[in-house]
Amino acid sequence: VKMKAKTALDKGISCILKTQYVQNGKPTVWCAQHDEKTLLPANARAFELASLSGQESDDIVLFLMSLSKPSPEVVNSIEAAVEWFRQNEIDGYKIENFKNSDGKKDWRLVKCAEGEESKPLWARFYTLEDNRPFFCDRDGVMKFDVSEIGHERRTGYSWYNSEALKVFKKYEQWSKKYGKNKTEGN
């Protein structure tokens, strides 16, 4: 049973490494969905277009960092993903909740006031070509401003989060043990 579990884990890790999206020759993060046969980025529901995921990817990186003896390939994968999160961090903005003109709960992304503290944010979806945050309604049309999608999808889906902060926190300890120059001999 132990051997079967190890084989299954190794296959899963191999799949994770194969699905890390390569953009302009550089590994990034993972897509929200991948085709089950080709492993390429894929659409899911109408509002879930093929995209890089600023949400699903953080759990993948946390899982990879939990491995007790990461291979050089896993180390490189983690390093590339952490770098992508750093480069695509959205600073100086916050989520503002409000009641819209219909009296319904709503939200918007607003620029922080000078000197105001805010957590960095990451979008749920980024374009595959150039890492632009985007949003989508049930019509399947990509929008670059969340206010352009309907209230139901805007408020019924998690479009921004700060979960990558967990990645950065764990990476601090992980990199001391396994970072780029620490894997010789593993």
What are these regions (language model features)?
Residues V1-P27:
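Beta-propeller domains
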